[in-house]
Amino acid sequence: MNRLPSSASALACSAHALNLIEKRTLDHEEMKALNREVIEYFKEHVNPGFLEYRKSVTAGGDYGAVEWQAGGLNTLVDTQGQEFIDCLGGFGIFNVGHRNPVVVSAVQNQLAKQPLHSQELLDPLRAMLAKTLAALTPGKLKYSFFCNSGTESVEAALKLAKAYQSPRGKFTFIATSGAFHGKSLGALSATAKSTFRKPFMPLLPGFRHVPFGNIEAMRTALSECKKTGDDVAAVILEPIQGEGGVILPPPGYLTAVRKLCDEFGALMILDEVQTGMGRTGKMFACEHENVQPDILCLAKALGGGVMPIGATIATEEVFSVLFDNPFLHTTTFGGNPLACAAALATINVLLEQNLPAQAEQKGDMLLDGFRQLAREYPDLVQEARGKGMLMAIEFVDNEIGYNFASEMFRQRVLVAGTLNNAKTIRIEPPLTLTIEQCELVIKAARKALAAMRVSVEEA
């Protein structure tokens, strides 16, 4: 690979990149050159902050491996040929594994026909995916709006709730502390981390936050809003807070929130962007309590780790506010044929291989192992918790969490922290992780903690 000069034209840059894309393998010198290029371009044209983040959680204090390809369903290979077990899962993207052949084949077959829709004619895969989601999702959820990401699915949910509740004089939204719903302006108004919120203040008016898992706080907020005339349009929450640190609410919490929403005439929006698609041992986390939301947000794993897609699914009563003018909320690429092909294949794989049940089985195995390590290393580990294949190890302080991620990197296991809780390392592997790989992950965690204890004692 010849190095591009700093003054290279856009044509030269694109040709250089296409040459790289066509390559199946790289020799040693090409790998070194690519690493240097990627680091330089991140620093000069993407964001140097990403380099410093990776430096803090990779072995040797370097900038980390440069990703080259998937090694299998559950592994990644860097440009140095090192293979890593993926326990990060792209923050919940790879539920059916990396490059799942069923998903890749569906996308390739659709690509051979028509990659994007005309915008004017009816596109069949959007219709088929909407029908499939109506059959898959709980309760009376029936109509789907398609977009490209989780934050877009939340934006659509908020706008849908506003359109439905505004004629009823209800404009307030209640979210929860520790919540993460995205970083676009509406979704950020529901997100609860000051680091992300403060630079963009003031956010949208009418959002309140109450402690997650505290049903009395939720009741009080709904009641006070009613007394002051700030009636609540919707309650939005995650069944399990992912970026908050994999925080599980008390048993019965979702059921109680559903009852409060019914009592006060508020819609219930469940953000299952991270918990959905089999991640917690059920297809959707709300199914653990048989709770049926009015609006459901999906993304991440819906595209099978191959295509980006988000979906906002609602009951007919709520969604009908868009019937008269379906152009009130649209997006150019939402529901495109390639994304819908990926989503349909993903759903098929999840059901055919019963991956939600596998997530429950293998998640229990991993969590048992992590809890045993927490008992062995109480000086380092505060708690291990989770449900299915969404788990977290919380450490006694932030620095230990970063060190653990770095040590796991040495053991060739990828993990990462959560955006709203720096003490917590998230374990979110593909649901296709094998039993043998689960055992290797636990062994790697034990080695990492042992090395960390030695470092602490020597210090």
Swiss-Prot record:
Task: Tell me its cofactors.
Answer: pyridoxal 5'-phosphate
Q: Name one GO biological process term.
A: putrescine catabolic process
Q: Which UniProt keywords apply?
A: Aminotransferase, Pyridoxal phosphate, Transferase
Pathway as given in its UniProt record: Amine and polyamine degradation; putrescine degradation; 4-aminobutanal from putrescine (transaminase route): step 1/1
**Name assigned to this protein:** Putrescine aminotransferase
Q: Which InterPro entries match?
A: Aminotrans_3, Aminotrans_3_PPA_site, Class-III_PLP-dep_AT, Putrescine_aminotransferase, PyrdxlP-dep_Trfase, PyrdxlP-dep_Trfase_major, PyrdxlP-dep_Trfase_small
User: Could you tell me what reaction this enzyme catalyses?
Assistant: an alkane-alpha,omega-diamine + 2-oxoglutarate = an omega-aminoaldehyde + L-glutamate; putrescine + 2-oxoglutarate = 1-pyrroline + L-glutamate + H2O; cadaverine + 2-oxoglutarate = 5-aminopentanal + L-glutamate
- Record's function text: Catalyzes the aminotransferase reaction from putrescine to 2-oxoglutarate, leading to glutamate and 4-aminobutanal, which spontaneously cyclizes to form 1-pyrroline. This is the first step in one of two pathways for putrescine degradation, where putrescine is converted into 4-aminobutanoate (gamma-aminobutyrate or GABA) via 4-aminobutanal. Also functions as a cadaverine transaminase in a a L-lysine degradation pathway to succinate that proceeds via cadaverine, glutarate and L-2-hydroxyglutarate.
Which Gene3D superfamilies does this entry report, sorted A to Z?
Aspartate Aminotransferase, domain 1, Type I PLP-dependent aspartate aminotransferase-like (Major domain)
What's this protein's family per the entry?
Answer: Belongs to the class-III pyridoxal-phosphate-dependent aminotransferase family. Putrescine aminotransferase subfamily.
What organism is recorded for this protein? Escherichia coli O17:K52:H18 (strain UMN026 / ExPEC)
Q: Which SUPFAM superfamilies match?
A: PLP-dependent transferases
- Which HAMAP family does this entry report, sorted A to Z? Putres_aminotrans_3
Molecular-function GO terms, alphabetical: diamine transaminase activity; identical protein binding; putrescine--2-oxoglutarate transaminase activity; pyridoxal phosphate binding
Residue numbers bearing the N6-(pyridoxal phosphate)lysine modification: 300
**Gene name for this UniProt entry:** patA
Instruction: Write down the superkingdom of origin.
Output: Bacteria
The EC number(s) given in the record are 2.6.1.82, 2.6.1.29
Q: Which residues bind pyridoxal 5'-phosphate?
A: 150-151, 274, 332
